Amino acid sequence: NYADRKACTDINIYRQSVDEQFYSYIRPQENGTKSDIRWWKQLNHSRNGLQIVAEAPFSASALHYTIESLDEGIAKAQGHSPEVEKANLTNLCIDKVQMGLGCEDSWGRIARPEYQIPYADYEFTFILTPVKHQVGIE
């Protein structure tokens, strides 16, 4: 749910595995970002991990792919999503804000002005807290 795609999503507590957050688009690309979140908890199979809480709503995603493997620049040499190998890690991205996707009438169109991020200095404060043997949801 990116800035220009989130109007139809409810604010709620959601639970997904990292694998469930990835959508295999034909052309590999970043995806799975959640916007306007208040906190994010990332746990491994042993229920250990991190909780992220920020002073203002933020965006985050977690994938078993590196950014570089999903977007190799203009050449797009990686071809199709099934050709991209999973990384032996969880790539957690924490963002103050992300630009909208655009693509309203074609894939080349940039986001409307209200969904763009003006060039400026930004501050983003968040707290990382270790989580050990988490049981249930808060």
Predicted ranges, named:
Residues N1-E138:
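Beta-strand/loop-rich accessory regions of lumenal/periplasmic or secreted enzymes
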